[in-house]
UniProtKB/Swiss-Prot annotation:
Protein family: Belongs to the PRA1 family.
PANTHER family: PRENYLATED RAB ACCEPTOR 1-RELATED (PTHR19317), PRENYLATED RAB ACCEPTOR PROTEIN 1 (PTHR19317:SF0)
Membrane topology of the entry: Multi-pass membrane protein
Protein name as it appears in the record: PRA1-like protein
Keywords, ordered alphabetically: Membrane, Transmembrane, Transmembrane helix
Example GO biological process: endoplasmic reticulum to Golgi vesicle-mediated transport
GO cellular component: COPII-coated ER to Golgi transport vesicle; Golgi apparatus; membrane
Organism this protein belongs to: Schizosaccharomyces pombe (strain 972 / ATCC 24843) (Fission yeast)
Amino acid sequence: MSALSLSITKVSETFSEIYASRAQYLSGFKSVGEFLDVRRISRPRNFSEAQSRISFNFSRFSSNYLAIIAMLVIYALIRNPLLLIVIGIGVGGVYGIRKLQGADLQLSHRVISNQNLYVILACVLIPLGLFASPIETIIWLVGASCVCVFGHAAFFEPPVESAFETVEQQV
C-alpha cells in the first residue's frame, strides 16, 4: 500500500510541476493588442538601437515568439504532408517494435529479430525521408522564424515605461 501511495504522490508532484511550468509559460504571454500594436512599429535609427530593441523584446515577448514558431512548425508540416506521413510511420514503427518488448516477431514460418525490425524500418524511412525533403522544410522554418521574430523584435519599440525602469535601476 505504501508503494502505491508513493507512486500517487510522485505522479501528483509531477503534474503539479507541469502545471506550474505551464502557468509560468502562459503568464509570459502578452495580449494580441499589445503584441501587434502598429503604433509602436518604427525603423530603428542605427544598429545599436535595433540590438537593444531585440534584446528587450526577446525578454518581453518570448512566449509569444515561441507560439509563433510553434504555429510555423505546424504550418510547415501541413504544407509538407509527405514529411508528416514519414514522421507518423517512424513514430508508429518504433512504437510497434517497442510494443514487442524485445521479443522477436513471428510471421508464420519466419522469425524477425528486434534489430532486424529497426533495420527494416530505417531502410523504409531513409528513402521516404529524403524524398519528403526535410532539409528544405527545416531551412524554410529557420528562415521564416528568423524573419518573423527578429523582424518584430527589431521594429517594435519598447514602451516608454521601459526607459524609466533603466533610470530607476541606475539611481
